Every structure is written in structure tokens, then in C-alpha cells.
Amino acid sequence: LVAIDRTDPESCALSEVIVRGVSAGLDRYLDERPLFREVCPDQALFVLPIFNLQRYAPGEGFRQWHCDWTISDEVTEPVHRVLAWILYCDTVAEAGTEFHWQQHHEEAVRGKLLIFPAGPSHIHRGRVNRTHSKTIATGWINAGTREGYLRRLSQS
């Protein structure tokens, strides 16, 4: 998980840019799927302000099939996860993400944002390039409001 030092203006600004960009992507996703928000608890979704920033060396990657929903009680409240996102920070041939049930592969292209359901309907894994490194940011979109989440976080 990325821990942003709020006293470091550069890292704080980078975090905010990423969250704002994903929030804009979420708005577009919901514009294309108007019923999606309506069926969520509280009819609200928000981009979790905690996310992962991962750099994989050549030959490394998350090869295991997985989904992003779980019932653990960690600080990111995974039981509230509705959507997951991946932001590719560089272009890497023969990398990206593959989705099992959809039999679909997304190439790793710098600036590309993927938003997809976090549950078992979208089991996925990373594709690994043996000669180039890959950097991605990944996170989640939860049901509810950011304000409610931050309130719960401050009380824990």
C-alpha cells in the first residue's frame, strides 16, 4: 500500500492526481452504466484513497489468478469493494492483464486505466515480460461515500 507522507507536497500531489484521474474514469464508467450506481448500497461509489504502487522487475509479476473482493477486515474495507482499477505507468509489450472468464487481454499501455468488477466474475492475473520492468498503480472503488469511509477510518 502507498503511504503518503502528508508533509511531503510532491508525494501528496501525486497521490491526489492519481485519485482524481481514477475518479474521472469512474464517472465515465458510470455514465456508460447508469444502473450500476443505483444498485449499490447508498447509491454511491468512491475511489478509495489508499492504493498500491507496484514496480515489477523483468520476469516478475502477479501471475496467480485472483479477484479483488474478499471478506478480510483490513483498512481498505474489502467487503465494500465493488470495482477494481489498474493504471499502467509505462508501456510494456507482452505484459498487461488477462481476464479468465472473458478470455480477454489488456495490453500495458502508459496512461491506460482499467476499471472492472472486483468480484469473481472478473478473475484476472498479470502478464509478465521477461525483459522489461513494469510499473502499475492499483486500487479499489468501494460502495458508500469517501466521507463515511474517512470517518470510520478516523474512529479505528
For each feature predicted by the language model, list its residue ranges.
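Fe(II)/2-oxoglutarate oxygenase catalytic core
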Residues: 1-113, 121-156
